[in-house]
Amino acid sequence: AVCLPKNPNCESCPAASLCAAKAAGLQSRLPVREKNTAKPEKDLTVFLLTTPDGRTALRRRPETGLLSGLWEFPNVEGALDEAAAGAAVSVWGLEPRRWESRLTAKHIFTHVEWHMTGYTLEVAGDGPADFVWADAGALSDRAVPSAFGRYYTEAAARLKEE
């Protein structure tokens, strides 16, 4: 490294004769490093929905935008408490049968940070048309982004137990 802020090595630089910073005597102040700006944060509630016969719900993300076309566990925006999460599950036409665990996770993308609250619960019903109910084999065949890694690991372990 030759062109370093606070410690320039102009003598070793092949471009020293062309350098505007050196000509202006600014080499100890350039280049200027940009400070990391805070990433916007987004709260999500993720649902690891399982059935008594050993399947879990997945849905495909939209074809445009972040993680487009990949598979995800059903989720909604916001950090829902258990009562609100139960209402969200009911809106999908599912009946919560047994709440099993609450999992939290964080995933940092280059431009946004997700804070996820997850609920694992056994449900009855088919849910919306965009839900795919996957067994262990079907889950492993789906491209689920690492953002949902904690939930994927939990789902895979639960489906193996079935």
Task: Annotate each language-model stretch with its function.
Residues 1-162:
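Intrinsically disordered, low-complexity, charged terminal extensions of DNA damage-control enzymes
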